[in-house]
Amino acid sequence: MAITGGMQSSDMVLLLWITVICACCSFVDSSRSHRQLITSPSTTGVCRYGIKAECCYGWKRNRKGQCEAVCEQGCKHGECVGPNKCKCFPGFTGKNCNQDLNECGLKPRPCEHRCMNTHGSYKCYCLNGYMLMPDGSCSNSRTCAMANCQYGCEQVKGDIRCLCPSGGLQLGPDGRTCIDIDECAVGKASCPINRRCVNTFGSYYCKCQIGYELKYVNGRYDCIDINECLLNTHKCSINADCLNTQGSFKCRCKHGFKGNGQECSAVFNKPVKESPKFGGSVKDAIKKLLAHKNSLNRYNDIKNVIPETFITPPPKNRLQPFDYEDGVYIGGNDNDEEEGEIEEEEEEELDEEDEENVIEEEKLLRGDVFARQVKRAAVLSSQPISNTDPVLKSDEVLVDCRFDQGTCEWKQDSKDDFDWKHAERHNGNGYYMSVPASTSQKKGIGRLKLQLTKIYYKYCLMFIYRLAGERVGKLRVYIDENINPIWEETKNRDEGWRTAKIEIQESSTRKSSSITFEAVRGKDEAGIMALDNVFLSSGPCSDD
């Protein structure tokens, strides 16, 4: 009985151990089933998390609800078959299937005689004297040996024809050698709109357009614009802003500068919207010149007209000076009109005989050349026309130059450092002379010189000028070859146009023969010096 009882105890212990081991095994199985991969063909990439089925790590659910592998770098010439795992198409290799496979370098060689690698494939051709068979092998052919083809030949219905190993090659004029076909030029290439065709021998490939680079974006390779402005690879001026565009960039000069963007030069801080107007004596002198021009125009109109003997009554109201046959009148005075009528009746017969000669001696004035003679006294009182050259009793306008037709009688000095430039106003209304900001050297000198043909004891020189810039330089006026200027101006607070009036007094021992404008360039590269409306007359300047 004791033995029997001991045996029963050992059996119980053994049974207990078996139960514990089974429980542990079932626990391990249950823990493994918490994340179990489902290997069904229809559920590739699906893992079970407990009772829930989701895509495994490295897989994602597509629009159809199926789990598909994710390749972060993409598969250019292949397909993604697993997490970051590509299966390349024939003819390509590499982790991302973006490299051409050189089949001709494989062992064993795919061709019996000669192999030519192409993009994504290869071509076989035979040596001279052999024929390419349908299975890719080369067969000896006496006819092909006689054909002397560059890349072998084939026999079609008893006719021998030389072959080219690629569709991008064609038989040359001799019928034996192969020449390249430029698919890009003949339009056989097929490239996306944002890529350009690059021809190769026997083929071609598509490359991103200039200004684009190939990048992997949103699961595929595409040509993306290069931001030249961000990479600082543009060619814009330091005084211009770079604006990136698709495939290119644009340069736009900053505020205060002008140019094409690659070269920008400074402009005026205060653009001139209209031509400056003279005031005072300058305005009066110009009115006198215009009155004389009107007189000459009237003389020219009646030059070939036979004068009649009847008397034309003058108008009662004259608002500005006009030239008539016996002189210049200014309206507003009835007594002067009556006196003019009496003088006209008395002197009409004498003037008719000499009128033609007087008219021929008069010349039309131009605003950009020397004025011959302007009667200042004629504007103030009426005088009859004489048979001789008119003798001015007062001032003469020697120069009235606005630089609209060039530099008039002013000449560039050949011994200075730079020339004055002929510049157009911003509003397109006229021209002026300027010293450009980009001169070849600092403190350079540029001169404009005028030779005087008539000598007077006094001159009145009037002009407008502009000096813009912190250290733009100096503008001077010289008489003859004197070393000391009679007038000098530097930059002032008002950088707009200003009027200058200089009275030149001659001595009994010296007479002026030339007047010179001299510009001395300063250190400011963005400043400018300008000159316009130069007016020179004999006599003193008025105090108006």
UniProtKB/Swiss-Prot annotation:
Gene3D superfamilies, from UniProt? 2.60.120.200, Laminin
Every copy of the MAM domain together lies at 399-543
> Region labeled Disordered — which residues?
332-357
Residues making up the signal peptide according to the UniProt record: 1-30
Tell where it localizes: Secreted, Extracellular space, Extracellular matrix, Basement membrane
Question: Cross-referenced InterPro entries, in alphabetical order?
Answer: ConA-like_dom_sf, EGF-like_Ca-bd_dom, EGF-like_dom, EGF-type_Asp/Asn_hydroxyl_site, EGF_Ca-bd_CS, Growth_fac_rcpt_cys_sf, MAM_dom, Nephronectin_domain
Q: Where is the EGF-like domain?
A: 63-98, 100-139, 144-178, 180-218, 225-265
Per the database entry, which stretches of residues form a coiled coil? 333-367
User: Which GO terms of type biological process are on file?
Assistant: cell adhesion; cell differentiation
| UniProt KW keywords | Basement membrane, Calcium, Cell adhesion, Coiled coil, Developmental protein, Differentiation, Disulfide bond, EGF-like domain, Extracellular matrix, Repeat, Secreted, Signal
UniProt GO molecular function: calcium ion binding
Q: Give the superkingdom in one word.
A: Eukaryota
Could you tell me where the Acidic residues compositional bias lies? 334-357
The protein's predominant localisation is secreted
| GO cellular component entries | basement membrane; extracellular region; membrane
List the PANTHER family: EPIDERMAL GROWTH FACTOR-LIKE PROTEIN 6, PA14 DOMAIN-CONTAINING PROTEIN
State the protein's purpose: May play a role in organ morphogenesis. Promotes matrix assembly.
What family name appears in the similarity comment? Belongs to the nephronectin family.
Q: Under what name is this protein listed?
A: Epidermal growth factor-like protein 6
Q: What is the lineage of its organism?
A: Eukaryota, Metazoa, Chordata, Craniata, Vertebrata
Protein encoded by which gene: egfl6
